[in-house]
Design a protein with these regions (language model features):
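Canonical Radical SAM [4Fe-4S] cluster-binding loop centered on the CxxxCxxC motif
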Residues: 7-43
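Conserved Rossmann-like nucleotide-binding pocket used by diverse enzymes
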Residues: 18, 65, 181
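Glycine-rich phosphate-binding "P-loop"
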Residues: 34-40, 61-68
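Flexible, glycine- and charge-enriched loops at secondary-structure boundaries
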Residues: 41-42, 128-132, 197-204
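Short catalytic helix/loop segments, enriched in acidic residues and glycine
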Residues: 46
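Conserved AdoMet/S-adenosylmethionine-binding subsite of the radical SAM
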Residues: 49-61, 70-196
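Short acidic, glycine/proline-enriched helix-loop-strand junctions
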Residues: 189-222
Length: 222
């Protein structure tokens, strides 16, 4: 749990709750301890609710992150409990299971949606067959829902090059995405220890200029 952040829900003071478990094995994952279904640092839900009760006058929102939170069967009920306390509800997801994502989406005020790559390149990142189809199907659900969102792509320059990143942005724009963020990978801790550390190459004004023309809202994060 992160008790206070201004980064994980735009414009909101938020608490982030990290849900255990993920079905993908993204090579640059910087939270590999959250992949297993059970973890060593689990917090009882009652303790979380007590913490939130004490922060009702300080926090605006609670973000459910992971791992992949939509794999948790109890997520929708937990989201409703948080909303009943007066908080806005954020969700970080890659839409791993489209049905589970669609169910959780109905309980969210805002979604930070991860798009790893072009559909055809997904397995290079996630190491899971069919992951691209699932992700983009969930993206369609998100865009049709009317729920506020940000789509974001984590860039590791050994897994995606500038031409593919631009093609990804163009495909997102053609799909109806209005808000897109590119964020450089965190290399301090990665699931694939053999993956080379890629410099955070950000001095690409032509590429970022093209993306700013594609989207009404574009953000570049180091």
């Amino acid at each position: 749990m992160v008790p206070l952040t201004t980064l994980d829900y735009p414009g909101m003071l938020a608490c982030v709750l990290f849900c255990q478990g993920c079905a993908w094995r993204c090579r640059y994952c910087h939270n590999p301890d959250l992949i297993a279904p059970r973890g060593s640092a689990e917090i009882d839900w009652r303790r979380v609710l007590l913490f939130l009760q004490r922060r009702q006058d300080l926090l605006d929102a609670v973000v459910f992150s992971g791992g992949e939170p939509t794999l948790q069967e109890g997520l929708p009920a937990a989201m409703d409990e948080v909303r009943a306390m007066g908080f806005r509800v954020g969700l970080h997801s890659a839409g791993i299971k489209p049905a589970g994502f669609a169910n959780a989406l109905r309980h969210a005020d805002w979604v930070g949606f991860d798009v790893k790559a072009l559909v055809e390149d997904y397995q290079l990142v996630t190491q899971v067959k069919g992951s691209g189809v699932a992700n983009w199907r969930s993206l369609e659900t998100l865009l049709a829902s009317g729920v506020d969102y940000e789509c974001r792509t984590t860039v590791h320059w050994h897994l995606i090059d500038t031409s593919r990143l631009l093609r990804l942005a163009q495909r997102l724009q053609a799909s109806g995405v209005k808000r897109f963020a590119v964020q450089m990978v965190r290399t301090a801790s990665m699931l694939d220890e053999q993956l080379p550390i890629a410099p955070a190459q950000m001095a690409l004004p032509e590429l970022w200029g093209c993306m700013r023309e594609l989207f009404p809202a574009f953000v570049l994060r180091g």
